[in-house]
Amino acid sequence: MVRFSPLRDRQLPACQMIWLGGGYPELHAAGLSANHEMLTQLRAAHRRGVAIYAECGGLMYLGTTLEVTSGERYTMADIIPGHSRMGTRLTRFGYCEAQAQQQTLLAAPGEWLRGHEFHYSDFSPATPAVLACRKQRDGKTLQQWQGGWQSGSAFASYLHVHFAQRPTMLNHWLRAARRAL
């Protein structure tokens, strides 16, 4: 595993997989948008089939644009077509599970992922979601929504997953990375 910063670095390290974790891209939107070299390299990696996984803030970075609370809009990677918009209230919080509706980078159709969501933003996608998500308590479904988007070899969602809870997620991701070699 090689660390890199989409904010500070100008070049992607040589890799077959990219993991863009959570964070607060809205606090660095201008800098992320201004790093044209990194955005260009990330798009080129996607075109080559590099397996890209992004969660929460990573989803916002892979989107087309990010609108911060002041109303300013910044261009992002445009790998997952859609628009992120920051709000002032918590949009979703807590543990949930999601069932893949089609093949994704981390799951085959029908497989379940468990994770946690915590975000103040909304993502308005240009393509259909690939996960059916739900929040349950005491065996009762409290909420249901659609989430997660797949674009070629890239998958992004608000869901923060833990690979140890379902090791097959990592197996799916590794298989996708091998296809890009």
For the regions a protein language model found, what residue spans apply to each?
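Glycine-rich, charged/polar anion/phosphate-binding loops
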Residues: 2-8, 62-64, 99-103, 141-144
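Acidic, glycine-rich loop-and-beta core segments that form the ion-binding/anion-interacting portion
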Residues: 1-42
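Amide-donor transfer/coupling interface in amidating biosynthetic enzymes
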Residues: 86-181
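Solvent-exposed alpha-helices and their adjacent loops that cap or buttress functional pockets
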Residues: 10-12, 44, 53, 106-110, ...
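Structured core elements
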Residues: 1-3, 19, 54, 61, ...
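Generic hydrophobic alpha-helical scaffold/packing signal
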Residues: 16-19, 29, 39-46, 63, ...
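Short acidic (Asp/Glu) and glycine-rich catalytic loops that position anionic groups and cofactors
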Residues: 18-24, 58, 152-154
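Cysteine-nucleophile active-site neighborhood
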Residues: 25-105
